[in-house]
């Protein structure tokens, strides 16, 4: 008969296995709901689980091929991409799934409702999502308050953007407000220039605009680092739809300006591999399995162009452990999950952590 101590050690693993195995049933119920409603129900469930102390039933965050990126020690290679926890309400809930880092947002200086609903669509047979959310979020101040009680021991990223009614000529002011608002509680900040759902936002990826913004943010970094006696790395998230010469130009720019990291990629406007699917003609950014090959090829090309000068966080179409390992093989240092997590649940996190650890040890 096992001792109480043995039972105590086994319980967290048992609960995790039960959670992973029950996900298909839970997903079946959630997928009966409208996509955004299902998302809200999931977030509410995670908040209730935290309030009831149920997150403590799960195993503590384990290290697997830990890596230092931009001066931050990531306990494993797998993170949650921005977009699932826009308001920073469920950092501990998602962290309990085994993510080594959690990125919240996109947060803008002022709260905004985003685009009209419906704005989130499942392409179930293709294991894909189309969203045109439009940076719906409570604003950087509320995001800070929401995340203030977290106990998650991993890395916290804060994804920042501009408000929809801020013209591009004044976008830098919004990003400065976001950087200042996140500085004392974020481990890193991601500058989102690549969402297709805010009019004109992707224009900020043009080389001259991007150069000016990076220089403005880097100057502010120095001021904030001196004021707070801590450094917060700044990454930029870019689109998979960049033409090769545009991507190459940005890679040169990132190296010259000493950017600390790049997230590749955001969602795509392409509808390749979704032809004829229900909802495939909806406006918005496509994520999930149809983006997998495009995103991995993008990471591989970008890695060659950066030549190790700065780290890449690979995202886009990771639906299995082998997909995550392929991103590392292509040149990413870390990976992030979004749509794959919606379709496969917590089991995908563990699978990706294990596959990435094997891939990291082999290289």
What role is predicted for each listed range?
Residues 47-49, 54-61, 196-209, 252-308, ...:
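Glycine/Thr-rich beta-alpha phosphate-binding loop at enzyme active sites
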Residues 103-112, 193-195, 261-269, 318, ...:
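Glycine-rich phosphate-binding active-site loops on the catalytic face of alpha/beta enzymes
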Residues 72-79, 153-158, 224-242, 305-314:
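Short beta-strand/loop segments at the ligand-binding rim of alpha/beta enzyme cores
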Residues 112-127, 273-284, 340-363:
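C-terminal helical cap(s) of enzyme catalytic domains, especially alpha/beta-barrels
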Residues 87-94, 242-254, 308, 318-335:
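Catalytic cores of alpha/beta
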Residues 163-176, 203, 209, 235-256:
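Active-site glycine- and acidic-residue-rich loops that bind
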Residues 105-154:
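A gly/proline- and charged-residue-enriched helix-loop-helix capping module
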Residues 18-67, 131-136, 140:
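An N-cap/entry alpha-helix motif that binds or orients negatively charged groups
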């Amino acid at each position: 008969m096992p001792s109480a101590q043995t039972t105590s050690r086994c319980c967290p693993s048992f609960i995790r296995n039960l959670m992973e195995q029950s996900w298909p049933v839970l997903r079946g119920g959630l997928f009966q709901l409208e996509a955004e409603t299902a998302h809200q129900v999931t977030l509410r469930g995670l908040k209730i689980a935290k309030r009831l102390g149920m997150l403590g039933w799960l195993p503590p965050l384990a290290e697997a091929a830990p890596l230092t990126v931009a001066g931050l020690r990531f306990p494993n290679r797998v993170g949650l991409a921005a977009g699932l926890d826009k308001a920073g309400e469920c950092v501990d809930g998602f962290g309990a799934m085994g993510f080594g880092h959690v990125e919240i947002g996109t947060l803008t200086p002022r709260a905004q409702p985003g685009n009209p609903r419906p704005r989130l669509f499942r392409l179930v047979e293709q294991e894909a999502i189309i969203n045109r959310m439009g940076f719906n979020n409570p604003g950087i101040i509320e995001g800070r308050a929401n995340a203030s009680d977290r106990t998650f021991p991993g890395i916290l990223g804060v994804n920042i953007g501009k408000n929809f009614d801020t013209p591009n000529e004044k976008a830098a002011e919004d990003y400065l407000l976001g950087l200042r608002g996140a500085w004392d509680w974020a481990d890193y900040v991601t500058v989102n220039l690549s969402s297709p759902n805010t009019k004109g936002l992707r224009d900020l990826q043009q080389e001259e605009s991007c150069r000016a913004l990076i220089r403005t943010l880097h100057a502010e970094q120095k001021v904030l680092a001196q004021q707070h006696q801590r450094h917060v790395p700044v990454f930029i998230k870019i689109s998979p739809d960049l033409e090769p010469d545009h991507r190459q130009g940005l890679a040169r720019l990132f190296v010259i300006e000493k950017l600390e990291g790049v997230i590749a990629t955001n969602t795509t406007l392409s509808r390749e591999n979704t032809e004829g699917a229900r909802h495939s003609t909806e406006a918005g950014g496509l994520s999930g399995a149809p983006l997998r090959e495009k995103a991995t090829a993008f990471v591989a090309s970008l890695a060659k162009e950066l030549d190790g000068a700065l780290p890449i966080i690979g995202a886009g179409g990771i639906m299995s452990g082998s997909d995550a390992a392929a991103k590392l093989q292509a040149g990413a240092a870390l990976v992030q999950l979004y749509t794959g997590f919606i379709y496969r649940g917590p089991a995908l996190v563990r699978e990706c952590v294990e596959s990435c650890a094997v891939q990291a040890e082999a290289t």
